[in-house]
Amino acid sequence: MNVGELSGAQLDCWVARAEGFRAEVVKANGIEYCRIDVETVGHQFYQPTQNPVITAPIQFRQRYTLYPLDEISSKGAGTLRVWIAEAQMNPEFHDMFRDEQPLVAMCRLRVAEAIASGVIKI
């Protein structure tokens, strides 16, 4: 599995597994989404790639740094902004991911860390 290519509901589910949830991708009305099973509560939507309320605690706990980078595109300098999510302050894991969406970059970093540490197996 190439973590850098994960997106959407698939990425959401891998983040959920990294966070210790039982998760699965389900399809309803032609839309795929990640559904987690929360003990004593039941099923819930889980979309860390779209919800900063979910990703902010992950960023703080895992000591991730998130910053923008303006790149040169075919339209000129500063017309393409990507976001870098980096585990530079984490003493046990060092890596970085980039994406046009900051939460996607951070979610990919969380999945990569969980795989490297053995929290989730692929």
PLM regions with names:
Residues 1-122:
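Glycine-rich anion-binding surface patch
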